[in-house]
Amino acid sequence: MAKKTHKMGVAAGIVVIVAVVIFVRMMINVKTYRYSTVDTVLRNPLIGFAPNADYFDAVGDNTLVYVDVTWRELEPEEGVFDFASIEEENFLDTWRASGKNVVFRFVCDEPSDEEHMDIPDWLYEKTDDGIFYDTDYGKGYSPDYSNETFIAYHAKAVEELGKRYGGDSFFCYIELGSVGHWGEWHVKYEDGIKRLPSEDTLRKYVEPYISAFPNAKLLMRRPFSYVSEYDLGVFNDMTGHARDTMEWLSWIEEGGIYSEPEQPMELIAVPKVWESAPVGGEFTSEYSMEEMLTDRLDGTLKLLSKSHMTFAGPMCPIADEDEKDYPDEVYQVLKRLGYRYGISECVMTDIKLTGQLSVRLTVNNYGTAPIYFDWHMFVYLMDGSGNAIKRYDTGVDLTEICGQESADVKLNITGDDRKHLLNGTYSLAVGIENPDTGMPQVQLDMNAENMDGYFFLN
């Protein structure tokens, strides 16, 4: 009798367990969606190639353009800033209207084949203590960067640039710029050009940019102390040149001493600079673009990956030539420039007892660097016509998801929104919005139906 009672108890227990399982399954419904990556070029904002803005046909589908301006072009007469000519020559109204952004560099000395000055005549007359040079770099005029009059007028010029272009993120990356040949913070002192001044004096060329461009990310050619002090990025104008790039990477990873100024300056080790500030630059002119995209492609790709670069220009493959001739090679390069976000998994858990639909997304960055601007990822309720009815901020900080990293985000949907999703009236989509437009503008690396930046999850 005891055995029979025991068996009946066990059976009853099993019935209860089965009933609970059935009840839970009826009350909780879980759907999992997975998305593979896509093997295609993604022309996303704020990353990629930055061809010269004044070469219209070179730009194509690229989202960045490069503009450099000499002081002579900017301020031909004291206090008179010729923005109109700069904007016309570089098609800035066109690029702004088409949603592109600018990589900018202000230059005081750009060597060329002819004798010339890149500072205005009026400033030369007020200072007149630089030197005209003729070296294997070319010909030009190197100002005395320790001249306090020159420094004061430089601060005013950068201030005016900021008033014109620093109010939004159209000018998104500012390369400093200002000092040395091509704005690269070096001069050919061995040919008689006066060395750069001390670190404290050179600081006066950095500080005006900090206040003038609060919405942009600033970059320097070398990791001087200002890089860590002001959270600046870095740029390499010898990308693709193995020896020079490895030397540049050694500065980033280990620091060192920069002996060119009149007083040697310390280079600060910033091995993780790319995690919080952009790395840019351009391809070396030592080799042809054809050579870098063919015989030297493997080495170039490895250097790009090690550098965690976000953009390259103006020396870069251009749309109407290189991109047409070497599409596969260009794609390999672009894959190694900047972010490449995508959703790999979406889990929707509906709990009937609580009336709550939980959505968990796994956000991946398949690229080599994060985005450096405060762009938000949203989940959208989409109606049958493809209109976004409502949006939910996922709260994920995309700037913290570095290259080859991922993060899970969760959100809960209740009420009528949940009902419309469950009965199929609405569907879910995900997108990354440009805060300037309030619209999703990032192509995600995920194999999912998409429309105008909305990527459907179910």
List each language-model region with its residue ranges.
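N-terminal substrate-binding region of glycoside hydrolase catalytic domains
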Residues: 30-150, 266-305, 309-325
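N-terminal Sec-pathway targeting helices
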Residues: 2-17
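Hydrophobic alpha-helical membrane-insertion segments, chiefly the h-region
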Residues: 17-27
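Conserved, mostly hydrophobic/aromatic
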Residues: 65, 161, 174, 209, ...
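Active-site groove signature of glycoside hydrolases
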Residues: 130-150, 157-193
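Non-catalytic accessory regions flanking glycosidase/transglycosidase catalytic cores in CAZymes
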Residues: 28-94, 166, 170, 354, ...
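Extracellular/luminal regions of secreted and cell-surface proteins that mediate adhesion/ECM remodeling
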Residues: 333-458
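Catalytic-core regions of glycoside hydrolase
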Residues: 33-54, 96, 173-182, 188-318
